[in-house]
Amino acid sequence: MSFDINWNQLTIDDTINQSIKEFLDQQFKNISLPSFISNLAVTDFNLGEIPPEVTIRHIGDPFEEFYEDENILGAMNEANNDSKDEHLKNHGDGINKDSGYNSQNLDDEDEDDEDDDEDDEDEEEEDEDDYDDHDLGTINEGISLLNFNENSTTPSANSFAGSAAPPLPPPLNPSRDSFHSILHPYGVNSIIGATGAGSETPTNILNQNYLSSRVLPKISVKQKQPHHDDNDIQLIVEINYKGDMHINLLVNLLVNYPSPNFISLPIKLHITDIVIHSIATIAYLKKSVFLSFLCDVDDTFPDFDSNVQTPTSTTGGNFVDYYSNDATINKERIDIVKKIKIESEIGEVENNILRNVGKVEKFLVEQLRNILRDEIAWPSWICIDMNDDDDEEEEEESEDNDGGNSDLNDNDGKHGDGRTDETEAGE
């Protein structure tokens, strides 16, 4: 399932471009710069005119972590309290109107309620036992459903390829759907079981042995809470972007020999040809939209329906390539920016300065990738609050009403010929 994005609506107004530019500029100012550069600033950002290709891969309930957002939780609690108050009020009115109730009826009902409570507690204990059995299946649930390639060299593929059980349909309960069953067809298993130290990434999260011996990851299955709304929805989408977005930066290149800051040379850097191919989640709940990137898509995965070939690593020039054919290197679960090109504007200088320019380019690309990963890669996300638009509309309507009332008050007591009331004229 796919859909078209009206990308022009994002580029007509320059507000979005300006906001993203200010955000990136602030993020770059917060990082520690190496000794050979200074005064790093983002001077321009443009989304471009080419939209990404977005394909819906899964539809279900939003992740529980999105409900932990303070604004969302506060709004939901307020709505729940209002509904409870209304329910109690209606329930109380019904009791007062019913003359058939007496003390004996109430006592009998209390006894029945106690019996019902005991039955409910027994049922809840049974449900909790069943629920506990599924806790460790948060990420790995559905691993046996995967159809791995027998000849695959991926460690995780070998560990599950021997399963003789026939594939089963995915769970009907959306909250029980696993990351693994959703993301497997897009090359995620290529990073499962990888070695090397690192942070909490799917390299560890999607490893079954890791789950059985370590603390459960943050992503966990929880029972549906009262603050969930039936209209809440989450899309797991595949984003493939090869557009004309560009970022312009200005930085001073420093030569610290024979003394610190001996030469300061301004350099303009143009970042273009950005390639993004990732799986992301888009959740809509309580008039708020959440966006978070989950993992990169491996275009070389044999089950992935793509003819794209992995380009070889380039040498020289200003093209920075993140692809690596060395499986022994510990790969982060997500880069978001898979490929990028940097063009430098600099005058004629000595060769040692040009070598430093390459260092600057590599540093900036790494920092850009880190910023995106820290801000919009799971377990981080961005939240777009749609309630702000409603508040602005209400304020505008209120101002219009106040203006109309003010005009009426100004005209009150005046006649068409400009005379005041008779009492005032008499005085």
UniProtKB/Swiss-Prot annotation:
Composition-biased stretches (Polar residues): 146-161
GO-annotated biological processes: mitochondrial genome maintenance; mitochondrion-endoplasmic reticulum membrane tethering; phospholipid transport; protein insertion into mitochondrial outer membrane
Keywords: Endoplasmic reticulum, Lipid transport, Lipid-binding, Membrane, Mitochondrion, Mitochondrion outer membrane, Transport
Protein's job: Component of the ERMES/MDM complex, which serves as a molecular tether to connect the endoplasmic reticulum (ER) and mitochondria. Components of this complex are involved in the control of mitochondrial shape and protein biogenesis, and function in nonvesicular lipid trafficking between the ER and mitochondria. MDM12 is required for the interaction of the ER-resident membrane protein MMM1 and the outer mitochondrial membrane-resident beta-barrel protein MDM10.
Domain SMP-LTD, residue spans: 1-387
Extent of the signal sequence: none
Binding partners and assembly: Component of the ER-mitochondria encounter structure (ERMES) or MDM complex, composed of MMM1, MDM10, MDM12 and MDM34. A MMM1 homodimer associates with one molecule of MDM12 on each side in a pairwise head-to-tail manner, and the SMP-LTD domains of MMM1 and MDM12 generate a continuous hydrophobic tunnel for phospholipid trafficking.
Similarity-based family: Belongs to the MDM12 family.
Chain positions covered by the region annotation Disordered: 81-168, 387-427
Name listed for the protein in its UniProt record: Mitochondrial distribution and morphology protein 12
Source organism (scientific name): Candida albicans (strain WO-1) (Yeast)
Any one GO MF annotation of this record: lipid binding
